Amino acid sequence: MILAIDIGNTNICIGGLEGDRIRFAFRMVTRPHCTPDEYTAELRFLLRRFQFEKAACTGAILCSVVPALSGPLAEAVRRLTGFEPLRVAHTLDTGLTFAIDAPERLGQDRIADAAGAAALYSLPCMTVDLGTASTYNVISADRRFLGGFIVPGVQTSLRAISAGTAQLPPIAPEAPARLIGKNTEECLNSGAVYGTAAMLEGQIGRAHV
């Protein structure tokens, strides 16, 4: 079993992978100042819930968009698995080439998205990862990473509009009951959700590979 760790800006996702099967998966809130000892204790407690056994682990892989947490999480993984986690990077043998400026600065999450899409789906394709920042990646038929787009995530946009205005309240996005909102909260929610969907459709229509 491979222990996979995905460090995002909002959540840290952990999964146990056996071949194509996900044995378990859970999330932790991303906290910027945790020590290796704290992460080791928290991970050990959560992994026990899924009957994780060190002897059954054959490796680990780490993907991070929060560089300050990569070291503490990697140390926790070493302690819990006995393995040095493989770090996602553009230099890994994913079968992709990177037709972009400064591939060493490309986010590890975008590399993982592109590699997974190229392995699982026909090309060319576009990946969309809706997170704190939403990323769009374009992969050509000959397995070249061509670049993409980065935009604020749905929740990030809603937080920004609330923080930057006097009367618009903070809300959590949910499936809208209708397109045209009848009150402020509905208008914010519909704008965020349908606006994101329209942007996604528009970018797909404009990206020709």
What are these regions (language model features)?
Residues 67-79:
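N-terminal/domain-start alpha-helical segments
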Residues 2-45, 144-165, 169:
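Short glycine-rich, Thr/Ser-proximal phosphate-binding strand/loop in the N-terminal lobe
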Residues 63-70, 190:
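Glycine-rich phosphate-binding loops at beta-strand->alpha-helix junctions
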Residues 207-209:
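Conserved small/polar residues in nucleotide/adenosyl-binding loops
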Residues 162-196:
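A mobile "lid/hinge" subdomain adjacent to the ATP/sugar-phosphate binding pocket shared
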Residues 54-65, 84-86:
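Short glycine-rich phosphate-binding loop at a beta-alpha junction
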Residues 75, 83-87, 92, 96-164, ...:
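Phosphate-binding/catalytic loop of phosphoryl-transfer enzymes
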Residues 2-6, 61, 125-129:
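Short glycine-aspartate micro-motif
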